[in-house]
Amino acid sequence: MDVVAPAMAAWPETLGKIIWYENDGATDPSWTVADEFAVHNPTTVQVADMDGDGDLDIVSGARGEDEGPNPITWYENDGAADPSWVAADIALTGNNSGLNDIVAKDMDHDGDIDIVAALYNSDTIAWYENDGNADPTWAAANISTSVDAAHTIVARDMDGDGVMDVSSLGAGNKRINWHENGGTRSSTAHWSIS
């Protein structure tokens, strides 16, 4: 198994990195840096097939430049044995929104991978719906705007109804929230907070 990880810079004005460590496949494996991407203050990374072409792409969340927008970016894998990557923004979450965490899951059960993000400074859990095209576009919607200092998110089917729900941690009030997806496997997702 390979590893993809964010590496924040020591100073805000310097770039951080998203680094892909490739496993050599040995019984006692070692990893080498296979690729890296310069990113301002990366906070989180996910690996998923974002465009449905059968290979794994990389998605990163970052705090961006000082007081600037916080990008969610996906790096499209070209599918080669030694892949090349093309970066495209999924969303710019707003100046100084405090993008803290992302999850890449099929939230609306339509067969493509969507993004959920925790935005610390705006107390928001946001959902970016993938339209499912080979060159996807993303529709933004808020799951909640009342998670005090939104910090960490997990997407799972919490109530066994066949659709993805979201759990979030509000670091400000140290509260764990459950955002129930009230949609069905054949209807649009909609959310309530418990």
Model regions: which residues?
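Short glycine/acidic-enriched loop and turn motifs that connect beta-strands
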Residues: 8-13, 63-68, 121-123, 171-174
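Blade-edge motifs of beta-propeller repeat domains
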Residues: 21-40, 76-97, 129-148, 180-194
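Short coil/loop residues immediately preceding or within conserved phosphate-binding loops
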Residues: 15, 42, 69, 99, ...
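A short loop-to-beta-strand structural motif that recurs across blades of beta-propeller domains
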Residues: 16-21, 70-75, 124-128, 174-179
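Glycine-aliphatic tripeptides that mark coil-to-beta-strand junctions in extracellular
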Residues: 1, 5, 54-56, 111-113, ...
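Beta-propeller blade termini
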Residues: 43-50, 100-107, 142, 151-158
